[in-house]
């Protein structure tokens, strides 16, 4: 079968890559074309557009890059039209993906499956109307979403487990439990440049009182999650401006 996937950020890229591997296990002849990232590309298929070119958030950033986003939408529709996949699989990223779902559904091109459902319980609950009209099957990685969709909105949804739990288990199997060498704070500033720029400096200022320079090893260790598509220089520059002791901070990919 031919699968067209769309993931618009680093987490979606990671989860979509695992989904592609699972599909290959049951459909060895599967072929993929996708909007995604490095993780999906490592599995195989054809990367049509990297998510870093479309990962904008907030009114101002979206407005500034609107021509790029609209070009991405037009190209995505054209690629689906010309390739004629057997299924379109949307991974999170609802602002873009629901527009694609609408197009594919109205053109009756193929079934539309949504993996990692839009977080309409948090905001933009009105998106349930688009989901109901244009999505054939919805898959959730958060168990409480089942009650939300089925009891509140009477829309069927399937809980398929949380891939992040699998990632944690795999990491601990490879690296073992963290060493008890003091306290650790994980900072997760996001995967988009704007998120990182806006969030990380504030996070570092919040933890700075715990990392003041003193004798011996610091009691608190700061671990910053580095997004796959972002250069490390972006993080180191923000850390330096924050004035934290270098030995207290570690970038983790």
Give each language-model segment a name.
Residues 235-253:
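Nucleotide-activated donor-binding/catalytic signature segment of Leloir-type glycosyltransferases, i.e.
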Residues 29, 109, 182, 217-219:
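A general structural motif
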Residues 3-176, 187-199, 209, 229, ...:
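Active-site and donor-binding regions of nucleotide-sugar-utilizing enzymes
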Residues 2, 180-186, 221:
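Charged active-site motifs of nucleotide-sugar-dependent glycosyltransferases
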Residues 198-217:
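Short hydrophobic signal-anchor/transmembrane segments that target glycosyltransferases
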Residues 59-60, 219-223:
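Short beta-strand elements in bilobed, periplasmic/extracellular small-molecule ligand-binding domains
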Residues 222-233:
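Glycosyltransferase donor-sugar binding loop
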Residues 216-221, 248-249:
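Flexible, glycine/charged-enriched surface loops at secondary-structure junctions
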């Amino acid at each position: 079968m031919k699968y067209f996937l769309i993931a618009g950020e680093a987490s979606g890229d990671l989860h979509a890559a695992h989904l592609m591997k699972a599909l290959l296990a049951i459909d060895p002849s599967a072929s993929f074309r996708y909007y995604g990232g490095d993780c999906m590309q490592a599995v195989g298929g054809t990367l049509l557009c990297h998510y870093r070119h479309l990962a904008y958030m907030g009114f101002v950033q979206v407005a500034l890059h609107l021509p790029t986003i609209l070009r991405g939408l037009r190209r995505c529709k054209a690629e689906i039209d010309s390739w004629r996949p057997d299924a379109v699989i949307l991974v999170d990223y609802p602002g873009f993906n629901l527009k694609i779902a609408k197009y594919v559904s109205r053109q009756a091109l193929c079934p539309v499956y949504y993996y990692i459902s839009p977080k309409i319980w948090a905001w933009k609950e009105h998106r349930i109307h688009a989901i109901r009209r244009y999505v054939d099957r919805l898959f959730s990685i958060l168990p409480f979403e089942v009650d939300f969709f089925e009891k509140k909105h009477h829309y069927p949804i399937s809980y398929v487990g949380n891939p992040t739990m699998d990632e944690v288990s795999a990491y601990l199997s490879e690296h073992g439990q963290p060493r008890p060498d003091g306290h650790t704070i994980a900072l997760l500033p996001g995967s988009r440049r704007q998120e990182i720029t806006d969030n990380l400096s504030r996070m570092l200022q919040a933890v700075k009182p715990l990392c003041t320079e003193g004798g011996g090893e610091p009691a608190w260790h700061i671990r910053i999650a580095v997004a796959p598509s972002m250069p490390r220089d972006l993080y180191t520059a923000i850390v330096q401006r924050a004035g934290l002791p270098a030995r207290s901070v570690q970038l983790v990919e």
